[in-house]
Curated annotation (Swiss-Prot):
Lineage: Eukaryota, Fungi, Dikarya, Ascomycota, Pezizomycotina
Region annotated Disordered, chain positions: 1-90
This protein's UniProt keywords: Cell membrane, Glycoprotein, Membrane, Transmembrane, Transmembrane helix, Transport
Bias (Pro residues) ranges: 68-90
Alphabetical list of InterPro entries matching this protein: Choline_transptr-like
Protein name in the entry: Protein PNS1
């Protein structure tokens, strides 16, 4: 009796009673693979019900092979494997959506409304800042303004942006040139930089900032030490992602364009932040308060919260759009490496900005809300520390850790859901559910947990954020602006400098994480493609992590 075919898995996993798409159909006849003496066991079979093919010969699509078993349910058509015997197909043909529609459109409209609101607040605030520019200039440290942020702060954020761009670019360059040493260097440099920043702040008796940075350093050091055994497998996955990106140069083009857009937005956001303080900060010396609308602390707090939320959402949307676009490139490489499609980058970007725009906006919204809550918790923790409230500081620290765990969980789901969205064009919740179910059932979650690239790149982004925060702190200490005579604005400026550095670096490094995430998701869809079309990668994975055979054949 022949084994089960795609679309008729045991237990009805891929039948029409659920929403899970089958792995991409293989357009070749399944032949048994002999026992590999290197691994000492018979090959395990995947979701297809049969073993991977014995040979890697071409001639696909000549009519002598078993046809695919039909499209998956719910209008999602899996990508066909290498189609030989004709011109390369386009991205839209390979990853065709049967019934395309604008998924999660309401989230897309809400995102556009938030962008419009941010632009409106920015325009009003910058106009008020421009009308009173003479009061906010005076000199580098803005001596004419003693009540709020000034042009001095814009100069500061310019240096922060320069630092973020240079370090992010250098970090990406180091990943390409020194891949094997990259993970060790990232962990060590991040810990050292965080420790230096914490000790310097403590030496200046800036207790709240120093304690927070010191806690981060201790947690990162413990994590890095406990994960030493996972570095070889992580290095292999990073090398694979970089090797593919070198062949398909659009990966770095997307990264460069995204980095430029992210930097420009960060500059625009920083100017808006300063302008809000100038326009609405209540003070008898603030000329802007004499105009219509007036000033109040409530307006300042409300607008700062709104532009912070909008900044998180817009930057997350940009990062996830890059992620979804790059996922299309790596998905095309995995499933069609021998007949790479045309217009891949264009097709993936088009889908991200049209049918999947709402889904990307929705996933980004969750992260933006969580990040905003964490930012508010950090501000409350710093305020409690400044007031000497030890219990409050500890409680806010615990709350921040819980929010951090929630952030990690949602980010984890988003990364793989967006890979599914890039290739299948499904709605956010359906993609998240289907992808996680498939990854879990395949055992790929074990490989994901074994790979450190996500945490390592987060370490790198944190290193850049540390540097930006340190520059902001030094700038505030040595230029001594009049508005910061009592040091009250130092935590605010340092926190936002940290945020800018973190988000800019995350945009630059997104293509690397996208590539690795897509490879994992593609392996869950069809591990036989890995063994047939990428045997060298499969054998190297087995060498550094022997349990990979059990994981991908679960």
């Amino acid at each position: 009796m022949s084994g089960p075919q795609y679309g008729a898995q045991p237990g009805g996993y891929y039948n029409n009673n659920n929403n899970y798409p089958p792995p991409p159909p293989n357009s070749y006849q399944m032949n048994p693979m002999p026992t590999d003496g290197n691994y000492g066991q018979q090959p395990q079979y995947g979701y297809g019900g049969g073993p991977p093919p014995q040979q890697y010969g071409n001639g696909y699509g000549d009519g002598g092979y078993a046809p695919p078993q039909g499209p998956p349910p719910n209008g999602s058509k899996p990508p066909p494997t290498d189609g030989y015997g004709g011109p390369p197909p386009s991205y839209d043909e390979v990853f065709k959506v049967q019934k395309p529609k604008y998924n999660d459109w309401w989230a897309g409209l809400l995102f556009l409304a938030t962008v419009a609101g941010f632009v409106a607040v920015s325009a009003i605030s910058i106009h008020g800042y421009a009308d009173n520019r003479s009061q906010n200039n005076g000199s580098l440290n803005g001596q004419r303004n003693t009540f709020g942020l000034t042009t001095h702060t814009i100069y500061l954020f310019v240096w922060v942006l320069i630092c973020a761009i240079v370090l992010s670019y250098a970090y990406m360059w180091m990943a390409r040139k020194f891949t094997k040493q990259f993970i060790y260097a990232t962990g060590i440099l991040n810990i050292v930089m965080g420790l230096v920043t914490a000790l310097y702040m403590l030496s200046r008796k800036y207790w709240s900032g120093g304690i927070v940075f010191l806690i981060f350093v201790v947690l990162q050091a413990l994590f890095f030490w406990s994960c030493r055994s996972r570095i070889p497998f992580s290095t292999l996955m990073l090398q694979t992602a970089i090797d593919v990106s070198k062949v398909h140069g659009h990966v770095y083009l997307v990264s460069a364009v995204g980095g430029v857009i992210g930097t420009l937005f960060a500059a625009y956001w920083a100017i808006t932040l300063v302008a809000v303080y100038v326009k609405f900060e209540p003070d008898p010396n603030n000329a802007a308060c004499r105009n219509a609308g007036g000033c109040s602390s409530g307006k300042v707090i409300g607008l700062i919260v709104f532009i912070t939320f909008a900044g998180y959402w817009i930057s997350e949307w940009l990062k996830n759009t890059i992620h979804t676009t790059v996922a299309g490139i790596y998905g095309s490489w995995y499933f069609n490496s021998r007949n790479y499609p045309t217009k891949v980058t264009r097709g993936a970007l088009k889908r991200s900005l049209t049918y999947s725009f709402g889904s990307i906006s929705l996933g980004s919204l969750f992260i933006a809300i969580i990040n905003l809550i964490r930012q508010l918790a950090q501000a409350a923790q710093q305020n409690a520390a400044q007031e000497g409230d030890i219990l409050g500081t500890i409680l806010w620290c615990i709350f921040g850790c819980l929010i951090g765990i929630l952030d990690w969980l949602v980010e984890f789901i988003n990364r793989y859901a967006f890979c599914h969205i890039a290739l299948y064009g499904k709605a956010y919740f359906a993609a998240a559910k289907d992808t996680w179910k498939m990854v879990k059932d395949r055992g790929i979650d074990a490989l994901i947990n074994e790979c450190l690239i996500g945490p390592v790149l987060t370490f790198g982004a944190t290193f850049v954020a540390y540097a930006c925060g340190l520059i902001a702190y030094l700038y505030m200490v040595y230029t001594k602006p009049a508005y910061n005579d009592g040091g009250g604005f130092t935590p605010v400026v340092v926190a936002f400098a940290f945020l800018i550095g973190l988000q800019v670096c995350n945009v630059f490094t997104t293509p690397l994480t996208s590539g690795i995430d897509t490879i994992f998701v593609a392996m869950a869809w069809d591990p036989e493609v890995l063994m047939r079309d990428h045997p060298d990668l499969y054998h190297r994975m087995v060498q550094v992590y022997p349990h990979v055979q059990e994981a991908i054949h679960a």
